[in-house]
Design a protein with these regions (language model features):
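N-terminal low-complexity, Pro/Thr/Ser-rich intrinsically disordered segments
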Residues: 31-47
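Boundary at the C-terminal end of the N-terminal hydrophobic targeting segment
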Residues: 26-30
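Short, well-structured beta-strand
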Residues: 32, 105-110, 146-240
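Secretory pathway targeting signatures of secreted, lumenal, and periplasmic proteins
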Residues: 42-44, 49-132, 232-245
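Acidic, glycine-rich loop-and-strand cores that form catalytic or ligand-binding grooves
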Residues: 131-153
Length: 245
């Protein structure tokens, strides 16, 4: 089912561009295993399968499909950054311990676990999306011009909050961020898709990435006794609430 849904999103989004890119992407699914890029610890690279993988340190898992590959350690993520940036990366600047790539690199998902404690969500229900956007704009750096919602934040009955926003920068750049927060008993898991744009993206573009982040986030499962509903009265409660994240 997961493979069908994710593949469907890809087909819808890219069908109109198929003829243009067909020849240049003819071998997109073929991987040169001798390429240094593919020797840094990628998993699900050979003999790919649909499976569930562990989210490091989170007492949780997430499902991947056979067209996805992943790195699940800061050390291997650092190797990738060193290669693509052609310079040394400080491992202390790397916060995620898991990244998932579509094999054709249509998307990359950073996955980070924060053991901040139990995150209360009561205040979130009293805030409007306008309130939250105002707070976000105040938090943004002086180099930003405007922040606007692509997906207004909401909280599901499964304690999952998905939202997305567009950032217009003073230098003319435009970026998009799609996020899902999955609340657990001792902290939360954050999924992020970060994209560059030019402001001329079509609706299919936004529908595609909205579908991807929501579908993948829905596969996250905390282990027994670690889910949000397993909270006990003497558990540590974070100083942050959902509205602060």
């Amino acid at each position: 089912k997961q493979k069908l849904i994710r593949t469907m999103f890809k087909k819808v989004f890219f069908s109109s561009f198929f003829l243009i890119f067909f020849f240049s992407n003819l071998n997109a699914n073929e991987v040169d295993l001798n390429d240094p890029y593919y020797k840094i610890g990628w998993k699900n690279l050979e003999n790919p399968e649909n499976t569930s993988i562990i989210i490091p340190d989170a007492n949780a898992s997430i499902e991947i499909i056979e067209t996805e590959i992943y790195l699940d350690s800061k050390e291997n993520i650092k190797k990738r950054l060193d290669l693509i940036n052609e310079q040394e990366t400080n491992i202390e600047d790397i916060y995620e311990k898991l990244i998932i790539f579509d094999r054709e690199e249509y998307y990359k998902i950073n996955i980070e676990y924060n053991d901040a404690g139990y995150i209360t969500s009561d205040r979130f229900k009293n805030f409007t999306s306008s309130n939250l956007l105002e707070t976000m704009n105040k938090r943004m750096s002086d180099s930003t011009s405007k922040v606007s919602w692509l997906i207004e934040p909401s909280l599901s009955e499964n304690n999952l909050s998905t939202y997305a926003y567009k950032i217009e920068w003073l230098d003319g750049d435009i970026t998009y961020e799609y996020k899902s927060l999955i609340l657990g008993r001792e902290g939360y898991i954050e999924l992020t898709i970060f994209l560059f744009g030019d402001g001329n993206e079509l609706e299919d573009f936004f529908d595609y990435y909205s579908g991807v982040i929501k579908e993948i986030a829905s596969t996250v499962k905390f282990n027994e006794t670690y889910s949000y509903s397993d909270y006990q009265q003497d558990d540590y409660v974070s100083v942050n609430t959902l509205t602060n994240l």
